[in-house]
Design a protein with these regions (language model features):
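Acidic/polar helix N-cap motif
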Residues: 8-11, 99
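Active-site/acyl-donor-binding loops of N-acyltransferases
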Residues: 59, 122-188, 243-245, 253-254, ...
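"Short basic amphipathic alpha-helical interaction patches in structured regions
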Residues: 77, 87-92, 107-112
Length: 370
């Protein structure tokens, strides 16, 4: 008889095998079993939120058949958040997967039902696909559309377009390679024709390297205006930063603190710059009156370091500022999904009053295994 039970260390080999089968079934090269095993153990058994023993009731789940085969899994990490300054229990889900031949058993539905019935006040995922979204909503959850919007700011538009073409097929890749020497000329023409949109970004704020202590102090202060926000201590925040550094190649992760002319800190940002010039923003934070200048500095910093474009998740509170800085928006997945029985929590999310960045969700955890 099939059953759902908590994930244990002894299950790691089977879950790793399931992960490789589900997420690397189209000929992609999967991470090695040893690397995946280490990843699953570290993430689900040795994170700051699991090792302190305060959230033992919030655990990852497996769907096991009568003969002991694991055919379904949902990874769950407890996180701490504050609702109007009051602590709430949050559970972030990731790697929701079911063995393809077992999907008729409704293992996915049963796993998600069990997850939703847990003791947490808020269930959250920020990297759901279309199928996961359908099941989630069918069981009473909701899509947080405002937190599913991504923004893109082009810095070198011709190179960005060629990058998109090169990813289509081999013929377009060759075509893009032939055109690449012309990119500086095309981008210069675009800068002259549309200087506000494609010109060299200009920065007015002063920058310093963002250290852990400064970030911890900023996290405690800047998001305090949000009704729903993360609650970090030094151990959990530093663990996340260490993981971000591990995932990036040397020099890829940029951490910058910003100050005005009076020396007052007005914001910061963290972004990862890949070898192909794409920058992924993990977190950008700023005071309301200074947020436009924070964006200007981010785009200037990315441009100076050779980025062709920067992208990230939209903070609904600053949608106008992103639009004013000529960012493009898209909302086609991955999806941010929520489930809660607390109307006050749902109201904060629906009103765009939740502080949610790449550090708070699944994105950072799953990056190592893409």
């Amino acid at each position: 008889m099939s059953s759902i039970r908590p994930f244990t260390k002894n299950d790691i080999p089977q879950v790793v095998n399931l992960f490789q089968k589900v997420f690397f079934n189209n000929g992609q090269t999967a991470p090695s079993s040893s690397n995946l095993s280490a990843y699953f153990e570290e993430t689900f058994f040795h994170s700051p939120w699991t090792e302190d023993g305060t959230e033992e009731e919030i655990r990852s789940l497996v769907y096991e058949t009568g003969d002991g085969a694991i055919v379904g899994f949902i990874g769950i990490i407890p996180r701490r958040m504050l609702l109007h300054g009051r602590p709430i229990r949050t559970a972030t889900s990731m790697h929701f997967m079911v063995e393809p031949g077992s999907r008729s058993t409704l293992a996915g539905v049963q796993l998600l039902k069990t997850f939703f019935s847990g003791p947490q006040d808020l269930s959250l995922t920020d990297s759901a696909g279309a199928l996961g979204r359908k099941i989630w909503e069918g069981l009473g959850g909701a899509t947080a559309l405002a937190y599913s919007i991504n923004w893109v700011r082009l810095l070198r538009p011709s190179r960005y377009v060629l990058r998109l073409l090169a990813r289509k097929n081999m013929l377009l890749r060759l075509f893009a390679a032939l055109l690449r020497p012309l990119c500086p000329i095309i981008d210069a023409m675009a800068s002259c024709a549309l200087p506000h949109r494609f010109g060299k970004p200009v920065a007015s704020l002063q920058s310093k390297d963002l250290d852990q202590e400064t970030l911890l102090a900023g996290i405690a202060q800047f998001p305090s205006s949000y009704a729903l926000r993360p609650d970090y201590d030094p151990g959990s925040l530093f663990w996340l930063l260490a993981k971000a550094d591990q995932l990036a190649r040397p020099g890829e992760l940029r951490k910058v603190a910003l100050h005005n002319a009076d020396g007052e800190m007005v914001g910061w940002y963290l972004y990862e710059l890949s070898a192909d010039g794409m920058g992924e923003v993990l977190q950008i934070v700023g005071r309301r009156k200074s947020f436009g200048e924070v964006l200007d500095h981010l785009f200037y910093h990315g441009w100076k370091n050779g980025a062709i474009a920067l992208s990230g998740r939209l903070d609904p509170k600053f949608a106008q500022e992103f639009s004013d800085k000529y960012c493009f928006f898209n909302c086609g997945g991955p999806w941010t999904l929520t489930h809660s029985r607390n109307p006050e929590i749902l109201q904060a999310i629906y009103q765009g009053d939740m502080f949610l960045t790449r550090l708070e969700g699944e994105w950072l955890m799953r990056r190592k295994n893409e």
